[in-house]
Amino acid sequence: MSTAVQVDDVMRYRDSRFQTIAAKLLPTQYLVVDDDTALTTTLGSCVAACLRDPVLKIGGMNHFLLPEGQIGDGAPARYGSYAMELLINDMLKRGAHRKRIEAKVFGGANVLKGFTSNPVGTRNAEFVRQYLQAEHIPIIAEDLCGIHPRKVWFFATTGRVAVQRLPHAHEAEVAATESAVRARLSKAPVTGGVELFE
């Protein structure tokens, strides 16, 4: 039996598969850790970037819904550009060195029906690759695009990642969750800000 605890809006629980504490990230969330906590999330068309400074053994994960949004749009953390800045800046505040940061990226599946000409998943995957290239952060592993949702576990201290591709039976559930979050966030008030570091 596992007991879930909510800290900093991120739910933590005992993961029996890996015998460790896990922090489950939902869309728009990110978390940076320097311990054995497994960062985990479930992705459809969304993307998660797992960043790590291998010298400090500090790392973090984000989970974003869309590449970019309109200025003044509510809930900016749903957008990759903002979510990436939040994650990178938090790591830098904790002592990570920008030149040592490496990335592993996941998600971007095309699970949303009706988006065939310019699928959200493909746009998210293209965005994260371009963003990290522009920031000179190397991608050392990726599992992007395709048609299957994924569950991802990231262990920041070791850099290890486990990815489970979910069967088609989960597609509708993941797509419905992402659509519901998008609908809720489209009504959210504008909040937050980004502090940029050089």
Swiss-Prot record:
Disulfide bonds: none annotated. The keyword Hydrolase applies. Pfam families: CheD. InterPro entries: CheD-like_sf, Chemorcpt_Glu_NH3ase_CheD, Cytotoxic_necrot_fac-like_cat. Its EC number is 3.5.1.44. Probably deamidates glutamine residues to glutamate on methyl-accepting chemotaxis receptors (MCPs), playing an important role in chemotaxis. This is Probable chemoreceptor glutamine deamidase CheD. The gene is cheD.
